[in-house]
Amino acid sequence: MMQKQNMIVVNQKEIAKNIYELVLQGTLVQQMNEPGQFVHIKVAEGIAPLLRRPISICNVDQEKNEFTMLYRAEGQGTKTLATRKQGEMVDVLGPLGHGFPVEEAEAGQTALLVGGGIGVPPLYELSQRLVAKGVRVIHILGFQTKDVVFYEEKFAELGDAYVATVDGTHGTKGFVTDVIDHYGIDFDILYSCGPLAMLRALEGRYKEKKAYISLEERMGCGIGACFACVCHLQEDPSGHSYKKVCSDGPVFPIGEVVL
């Protein structure tokens, strides 16, 4: 159930170049039951910046009423958010959207989780949920360069974790697909979140696999009212059929929407 709440900053730190880990506390956490959902953050008081920022939920601790989100500080809004200190309040709307279907993976199966850049964070909560139900997890994390790699060790605690960097400064040189090819990775179900180029590459390979992708889109309202984040359906690529990433997604079965 979506709610709005002023949540307390428990901790915030930079964990890689311009990548921040923000932990917030509040009873809203009790509504966060679906990995892959996101929250809409009002980054500052007043009207500037006007629009909220959508940020994925990385980790949920309902016993402490705390959740963690990771984000890249690159624009005015996220740079403002990066200045928030312990004890301050943050206006949070959420949880929003439809997340990853954990129930589609069965105990004893192997799930491949592929993340690219700031698409990596929502896979962490997903991985924990899968491990808890007896699913073997393999992670492939793609980044541009070593300076922006994060959470490699945390994912490795849950299952095999491979890193690819475009410039080869850490892990396998190249893209996430190069890791799959190099290690001959096989799996029963795929979950992925990241840039469109990466998602397209995975879709081209695994149309016949059970697979789910999470889209990263700029959003206005976050609740399906403004139509700023619509995407066409593959069965009607130039027609009037569409899905809204914020409310129908951000997670879709592979092959459903036009990437």
UniProtKB/Swiss-Prot annotation:
PANTHER family: DIHYDROOROTATE DEHYDROGENASE B (NAD(+)), ELECTRON TRANSFER SUBUNIT, DIHYDROOROTATE DEHYDROGENASE B (NAD(+)), ELECTRON TRANSFER SUBUNIT-RELATED. It comes from Bacillus thuringiensis (strain Al Hakam). Heterotetramer of 2 PyrK and 2 PyrD type B subunits. Pfam families: DHODB_Fe-S_bind, NAD_binding_1. One of its GO terms (molecular function) is flavin adenine dinucleotide binding. Responsible for channeling the electrons from the oxidation of dihydroorotate from the FMN redox center in the PyrD type B subunit to the ultimate electron acceptor NAD(+). FAD binds at R53, P54, I55, S56, L70, Y71, R72, G77, T78. SUPFAM superfamilies: Ferredoxin reductase-like, C-terminal NADP-linked domain, Riboflavin synthase domain-like. Its cofactor is [2Fe-2S] cluster; FAD. Pathway: Pyrimidine metabolism; UMP biosynthesis via de novo pathway; orotate from (S)-dihydroorotate (NAD(+) route): step 1/1. This is Dihydroorotate dehydrogenase B (NAD(+)), electron transfer subunit. Residues 2-102 form the FAD-binding FR-type domain. GO terms for biological process: 'de novo' UMP biosynthetic process. Keywords: 2Fe-2S, Electron transport, FAD, Flavoprotein, Iron, Iron-sulfur, Metal-binding, Pyrimidine biosynthesis, Transport. [2Fe-2S] cluster binds at C221, C226, C229, C246. Belongs to the PyrK family. Binds 1 [2Fe-2S] cluster per subunit. Binds 1 FAD per subunit.
